[in-house]
């Protein structure tokens, strides 16, 4: 039943780091968590963040620091930093707090599950054959040095009247092995026949557990 759980949540604080780093008491926790969700949803809709692989939110003394992991940092920064300043202003208006935006470049987008899933979704929306898009993604991921990759698409594939799921796998993708560094992401493609769901698992390597000093603790950190 390993396929029923989220590989990221399963490994958080073991081999994966938290995506939200802050402390909140009983009164603040829910408020901070909802605020994190709003920040992420806002950034996902911004054209400059379309190539973003993920967002990390940190809080310290009334301020918020958002790190945007992207394969296209120039698009997020904008001309002379104009886009970053615009994001800061809009996030401040959204949260009512000072927001600092950091940009982290994704060096190898072929090994990032979110970027691979988004790439497949865009191809399906452009009416590329879903099988062709999946096989191309598998090949590029394996060529980049992954130990294994699995891609699954679900929905009215090729306009079929009955929805179904199809998946392709290459290499080794263990689901119960905690030391396996599994990157996982989902995406959706909006087609004339309906929504096509995409899931991607990438086995990057085997790694040691995250040091205890880096653990934020379940009570003090939320993984939104």
From Swiss-Prot:
One GO process term, biological-process aspect: translation
Keyword NAD: no
Residues forming coiled coils: none
Residue stretches making up the KH type-2 domain: 39-107
Alphabetically ordered keywords of this record: Ribonucleoprotein, Ribosomal protein, RNA-binding, rRNA-binding
Disulfide bonds: none
GO molecular function (one): rRNA binding
Domain of life: Bacteria
Any Pfam family the entry gives: Ribosomal_S3_C
Cellular component terms per the entry's GO annotation: cytosolic small ribosomal subunit
Keyword Mitochondrion in annotation: no
InterPro entries assigned: KH_dom, KH_dom-like_a/b, KH_dom_type_2, KH_sf_prok-type, Ribosomal_S3_C_sf, Ribosomal_uS3_bac-typ, Ribosomal_uS3_C, Ribosomal_uS3_CS
Family label: Belongs to the universal ribosomal protein uS3 family.
Subunit and interaction comment: Part of the 30S ribosomal subunit. Forms a tight complex with proteins S10 and S14.
Reported function: Binds the lower part of the 30S subunit head. Binds mRNA in the 70S ribosome, positioning it for translation.
Protein name: Small ribosomal subunit protein uS3
Organism: Chlamydia trachomatis serovar A (strain ATCC VR-571B / DSM 19440 / HAR-13)
Gene: rpsC
């Amino acid at each position: 039943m390993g396929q029923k759980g989220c590989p990221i949540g399963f490994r958080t604080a073991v081999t994966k780091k938290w995506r939200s780093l802050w402390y909140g008491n009983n009164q603040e926790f829910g408020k901070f968590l909802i605020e994190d969700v709003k920040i992420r949803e806002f950034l996902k809709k911004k054209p400059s963040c379309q190539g973003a692989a993920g967002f990390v939110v940190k809080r310290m003394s009334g301020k918020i620091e958002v790190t945007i992991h992207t394969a296209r940092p120039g698009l997020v920064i904008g001309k002379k930093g104009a886009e970053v300043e615009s994001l800061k202003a809009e996030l401040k208006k959204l949260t009512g707090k000072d927001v600092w935006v950091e940009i982290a470049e994704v060096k190898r987008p072929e090994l990032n599950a979110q970027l691979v899933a988004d790439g497949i979704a865009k191809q399906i929306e452009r009416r590329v054959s879903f099988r062709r898009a999946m096989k191309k993604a598998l090949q590029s991921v394996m060529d980049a040095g992954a130990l294994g990759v699995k891609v699954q698409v679900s929905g009215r594939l090729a306009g079929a009247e009955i929805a179904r799921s199809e998946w392709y796998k290459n290499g080794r993708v263990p689901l119960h092995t905690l030391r396996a560094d599994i990157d996982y992401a989902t995406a959706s493609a909006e087609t004339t026949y309906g929504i096509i769901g995409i899931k991607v698992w990438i086995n990057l390597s085997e790694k040691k557990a995250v040091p205890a000093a880096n653990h934020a603790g379940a009570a003090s950190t939320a993984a939104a």
